UniProtKB/Swiss-Prot annotation:
<feature type="binding site">
    <location>
        <position position="62"/>
    </location>
    <ligand>
        <name>[4Fe-4S] cluster 1</name>
    </ligand>
</feature>
<keyword id="KW-0997">Cell inner membrane</keyword>
<keyword id="KW-1003">Cell membrane</keyword>
<keyword id="KW-0408">Iron</keyword>
<keyword id="KW-0830">Ubiquinone</keyword>
<keyword id="KW-0004">4Fe-4S</keyword>
<feature type="binding site">
    <location>
        <position position="68"/>
    </location>
    <ligand>
        <name>[4Fe-4S] cluster 1</name>
    </ligand>
</feature>
<dbReference type="GO" id="GO:0050136">
    <property type="term" value="F:NADH:ubiquinone reductase (non-electrogenic) activity"/>
</dbReference>
<keyword id="KW-0411">Iron-sulfur</keyword>
<dbReference type="GO" id="GO:0051539">
    <property type="term" value="F:4 iron, 4 sulfur cluster binding"/>
</dbReference>
<feature type="binding site">
    <location>
        <position position="112"/>
    </location>
    <ligand>
        <name>[4Fe-4S] cluster 1</name>
    </ligand>
</feature>
<feature type="binding site">
    <location>
        <position position="102"/>
    </location>
    <ligand>
        <name>[4Fe-4S] cluster 2</name>
    </ligand>
</feature>
<dbReference type="InterPro" id="IPR010226">
    <property type="entry name" value="NADH_quinone_OxRdtase_chainI"/>
</dbReference>
<feature type="binding site">
    <location>
        <position position="72"/>
    </location>
    <ligand>
        <name>[4Fe-4S] cluster 2</name>
    </ligand>
</feature>
<feature type="domain" description="4Fe-4S ferredoxin-type 2">
    <location>
        <begin position="93"/>
        <end position="122"/>
    </location>
</feature>
<keyword id="KW-1278">Translocase</keyword>
<comment type="similarity">
    <text>Belongs to the complex I 23 kDa subunit family.</text>
</comment>
Length: 162
């Protein structure tokens, strides 16, 4: 037994096997991405910054049903509905999301019957003050207008599974 230990220490078997293992991984392509310059793949169900969508004619989709407000586990959504219009529909006068409270669970998006509130593809929305994370209706509509093409594509891809 002692002779075996002496042979291993003289031949540095562990060192050589570790060196070859390191060289094996050293020569493989890198698994990481250079983040600010390269963007990783985001799937169609990615939950990023919230957005309110519009119909192609420019009218907002939200019908003030308040399902998203009711289902939000963090109670981050506040909606106030205006009076009924001549055609019997309602629209929101106030639609606020407190992004500090939001846990990005996606339940608001799942509850919406008209796909008005969605969690878009944007995840880079750092701010300097907490007040900037209180999204009002105008900010949410701007997000929807900015990301509409990608949001519509992601919803179309995900449609068979909904």
């Amino acid at each position: 037994m002692k002779l075996d230990q002496v042979a291993r220490s003289l031949l540095l078997k562990e060192f050589v096997s570790g060196f070859f293992l390191a060289m094996k991984y050293f020569l493989k392509p890198k698994a990481t991405i250079n983040y600010p310059f390269e963007m990783g793949h985001r799937g169609p169900r990615f939950r990023g910054e919230h957005a309110l969508r519009r119909y192609p004619n420019g009218e907002e989709r939200c019908i003030a049903c308040k399902l998203c407000e009711a289902i939000c586990p963090a109670q981050a959504i506040t909606i106030e509905a205006g009076p009924r219009r001549n055609d019997g529909t309602r629209r929101t006068t106030r639609y606020d999301i407190d992004m500090v409270k939001c846990i990005y669970c996606g339940m608001c998006q799942e509850a919406c019957p008209v796909d008005a509130i969605v969690e878009g593809p944007n995840f880079e929305f750092s701010v300097e003050t907490r007040e900037e994370l209180l999204y009002d209706k105008q900010k949410l509509l701007e997000n929807g207008d900015r990301w509409e093409r990608e949001i519509a594509r992601n919803i179309a891809i995900d449609a068979p599974y909904r």
